[in-house]
């Protein structure tokens, strides 16, 4: 019964929509017929006579005031439309027309197949939008105590936003905690410490967790019925407490490395114990997964400490071993740390080997992947590249490949070239980035600018070719060339990730639509004419009559036609014979 009732309502709705679409002319004539029949009771003739008498008594000042009032209202609407466009990036009138008026006027297709297809398309686009606007952990993030806090001490500015630090707190709770933490006092304290907003409270909680592990517990072991001995047993160290102290309390990279080494000893022991018990139940499996994340994080940060302290080869070895030991943990993006370290060693063959593995169509892209591939191809031709020579003889195959790689990288993240070419000042990278956004561009350029400078001519090639990308994608928000359309949400997310003193790079730049500019000019011109006509009616009448006489005069028409013909002749001018023979030779 319910399905029959629903089907009847759908049929009734479709009939009403069809009647509005095709029978509106019949309805219009019916209304006119009713008005004609009821003209005597409604006194339509008398009302029309009254209206005509009222219009005949109006003075020109009324029309001037009416024009000024309409211009004022149009100006207010224009201001509101401009504000709405600046804030939300779309026209309010257009949005209301498409979202609300179009369905009421029958602009929605009722075919079930079309609806299903459109819903599938919308879900795909929404899914793509969500994946594009996902915030990722920065694989090259700095140390809070040794780097971010030192910047704050020197400049007095906060390089991290609250939103960024809140995301880091959520990551720490996901990676470093599990449901069984309440069974161990130190882990229970650290579970609360990761939720603390105050840095000093977090550091104090980490020290408290380490102090609990120093308490010695006595275990009574009966040997015989008449005697016992006491065994002194130390509780295992808390690895996550050392991680927090290394990240936030250590003021130098050397101190952080020392604390991470202590964390490695504790974390390795916990990992081995949980590895043996992981098959005993879901609780032990979750604990082993947590211990695995802790161990991988510690080893990765130790490799980054070695990279910061100049031991680059040691850092590369640690990263390679870590990727071999845990090949499935791609959430940390260790290969991007490896690429940066290999570029520092100028081991370009090894960089190409890593790119061959990770620059795959099925894997998610990043600015590091795309721009490193462009750097390697630019390195082969950049030292001999000259824009003048290329314009004369054309691009060679290698140069064309390099230019295409640069265009591919710029399409993925168009903000990076401004930082590599030092057209925009760099800041400390955030702890989280948005792929294809300004935050990712800052994180990439902060570490890779030196590698581009080291390759002779690479920045020159980038400077000459990167803007050509935008000619291939005139509407980047609607259609891309090699990637999906550029996501709309990057500006909003980057403003939350980057500090307020940084000017966020916006792509594509929002330009006011032509109808807003045209409406602004028309309203301003009309209001000015109304004001001048109200103040100087006789003078404006003479001016209007003179302008009409000028436009209607024969001299004006002849001059306009001559100017048009002269311009066409200039455009179609044929070069002299000598010059044509020179080009033929």
From Swiss-Prot:
Glycans are attached at residue 47. It is a multi-pass membrane protein. GO terms for cellular component: membrane. The chain crosses the membrane at residues 15-35, 62-82, 512-532. It is found in: Membrane. InterPro entries: ST7 (IPR007311). Keywords: Glycoprotein, Membrane, Phosphoprotein, Transmembrane, Transmembrane helix. The modification Phosphoserine is found at residue 386. The keyword Transmembrane helix applies. Belongs to the ST7 family. PANTHER family: SUPPRESSION OF TUMORIGENICITY 7, SUPPRESSOR OF TUMORIGENICITY 7 PROTEIN. This is Suppressor of tumorigenicity 7 protein. It comes from Callithrix jacchus (White-tufted-ear marmoset). The lineage of its organism: Eukaryota, Metazoa, Chordata, Craniata, Vertebrata.
């Amino acid at each position: 019964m319910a399905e029959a009732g629903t089907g009847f309502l759908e049929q009734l709705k479709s009939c009403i929509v069809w009647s509005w679409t095709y029978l509106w002319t019949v309805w219009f004539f019916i209304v006119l017929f009713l008005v004609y029949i009821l003209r005597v009771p409604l006194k339509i003739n008398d009302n029309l006579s009254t209206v005509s008498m009222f219009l005949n008594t109006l003075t020109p000042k009324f029309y001037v005031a009416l024009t000024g009032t309409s211009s004022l209202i149009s100006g207010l609407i224009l201001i509101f439309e401009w504000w709405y466009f600046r804030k939300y990036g779309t026209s309010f009138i257009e949005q209301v027309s498409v979202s609300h008026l179009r369905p009421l006027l029958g602009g929605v297709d009722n075919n079930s197949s079309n609806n299903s297809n459109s819903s599938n398309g919308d879900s795909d686009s929404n899914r793509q939008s969500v994946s594009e606007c996902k915030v990722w952990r920065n694989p090259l993030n700095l140390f809070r105590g040794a780097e971010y806090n030192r910047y704050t001490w020197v400049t007095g500015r906060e390089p991290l936003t609250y939103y960024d630090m809140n995301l880091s707190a959520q990551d720490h709770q996901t990676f470093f905690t599990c449901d069984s933490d309440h069974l161990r006092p130190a882990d229970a304290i650290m579970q609360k410490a990761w939720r603390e907003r105050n840095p000093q409270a977090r550091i104090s909680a980490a020290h408290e967790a380490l102090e609990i592990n120093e308490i010695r517990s006595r275990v009574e072991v009966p040997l015989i019925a008449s005697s016992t001995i006491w065994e002194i047993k130390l509780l295992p160290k808390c690895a996550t407490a050392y991680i927090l102290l290394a990240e936030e309390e250590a003021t130098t990279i050397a101190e952080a490395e020392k604390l991470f080494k202590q964390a490695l000893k504790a974390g390795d022991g916990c990992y081995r114990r949980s590895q043996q018990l992981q098959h005993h139940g879901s609780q032990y499996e979750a604990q082993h997964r947590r211990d695995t994340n802790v161990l991988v994080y510690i080893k990765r940060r130790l490799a980054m400490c070695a990279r910061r302290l100049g031991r680059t080869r040691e850092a590369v070895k640690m990263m390679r071993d870590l990727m071999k030991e845990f090949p499935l943990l791609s959430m940390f993006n260790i290969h991007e740390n490896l690429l940066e370290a290999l570029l520092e060693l100028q081991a370009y063959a090894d960089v190409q080997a890593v790119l061959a593995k990770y620059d795959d169509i099925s894997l998610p892209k990043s600015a590091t992947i795309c721009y490193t591939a462009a750097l390697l191809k630019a390195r082969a031709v950049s030292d001999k590249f000259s824009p003048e020579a290329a314009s004369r003889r054309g691009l060679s195959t290698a140069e064309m490949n390099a230019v295409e790689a640069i265009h591919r990288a710029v399409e993925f993240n168009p903000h990076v070239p401004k930082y590599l070419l030092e057209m925009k000042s760099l800041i400390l990278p955030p702890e989280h980035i948005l792929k294809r956004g300004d935050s990712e561009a800052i994180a990439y350029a902060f570490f890779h600018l030196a590698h581009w400078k080291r390759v002779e001519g690479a920045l020159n090639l980038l400077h000459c070719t990167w803007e050509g990308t935008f000619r291939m994608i005139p509407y980047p928000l609607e259609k891309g060339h090699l990637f999906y359309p550029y996501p709309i949400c990057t500006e909003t997310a980057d403003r939350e990730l980057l500090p307020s003193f940084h000017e966020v790079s916006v792509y594509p730049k929002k330009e006011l639509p032509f109808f807003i500019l045209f409406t602004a000019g028309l309203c301003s011109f009309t209001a000015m004419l109304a004001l001048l006509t109200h103040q100087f009616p006789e003078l404006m009448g003479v001016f209007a009559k003179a302008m009409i006489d000028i436009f209607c005069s024969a001299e004006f028409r002849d001059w306009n036609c001559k100017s048009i013909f002269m311009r066409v002749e200039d455009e179609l001018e044929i070069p002299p014979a000598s010059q044509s023979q020179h080009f033929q030779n």
